[in-house]
């Protein structure tokens, strides 16, 4: 059987790219079962977002290519910037400031070990 690249994307996640990248660094290059364990015990909110995307990638591998979970490892985790919501925050003396609420994207690529 030839090697297959499996991709899953999470777009518009309510976390900044820098916070997502802290968790993504934990799982790059790891086996999928080890990566899931890392994410399960990581206490950051963005670990839940990345865990969902990783589970989606594993489901894609099993449904589309019939690949066993034990043969997969995390080849790449790409974290990028998504849209930013702009909000107004009232300040003193009738002024206003902008508040930016940043969102992020995550792309996980799994590869099969033979």
Swiss-Prot record:
Ribonucleoprotein listed as a keyword: yes
A molecular function GO annotation: rRNA binding
Highest taxon, organism lineage: Bacteria
Keywords: Ribonucleoprotein, Ribosomal protein, RNA-binding, rRNA-binding
A Pfam family assignment: Ribosomal_L22
GO biological process per UniProt: translation
Transmembrane feature ranges: none
Matches recorded under InterPro entries: Ribosomal_uL22, Ribosomal_uL22_bac/chlpt-type, Ribosomal_uL22_bac/org-type, Ribosomal_uL22_CS, Ribosomal_uL22_sf
GO cellular component, one term: cytosolic large ribosomal subunit
Sequence similarity: Belongs to the universal ribosomal protein uL22 family.
Quaternary structure (record): Part of the 50S ribosomal subunit.
Function summary: This protein binds specifically to 23S rRNA; its binding is stimulated by other ribosomal proteins, e.g. L4, L17, and L20. It is important during the early stages of 50S assembly. It makes multiple contacts with different domains of the 23S rRNA in the assembled 50S subunit and ribosome.
Protein's name in the database: Large ribosomal subunit protein uL22
């Amino acid at each position: 059987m030839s090697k297959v690249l499996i991709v899953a994307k999470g777009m518009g996640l309510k976390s900044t790219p820098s916070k997502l990248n802290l968790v993504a660094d934990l799982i790059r290059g790891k086996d999928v079962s080890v990566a899931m364990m890392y994410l399960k015990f990581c206490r950051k909110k963005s670990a839940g977002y990345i865990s969902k995307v990783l589970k989606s990638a594993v489901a894609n591998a099993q449904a589309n290519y019939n690949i066993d979970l034990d043969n997969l490892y995390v080849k790449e985790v790409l974290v990028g910037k998504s849209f930013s919501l702009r909000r107004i925050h009232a300040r003193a003396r009738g002024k206003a400031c902008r508040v930016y609420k940043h969102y992020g994207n995550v792309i996980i690529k799994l590869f099969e070990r033979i």
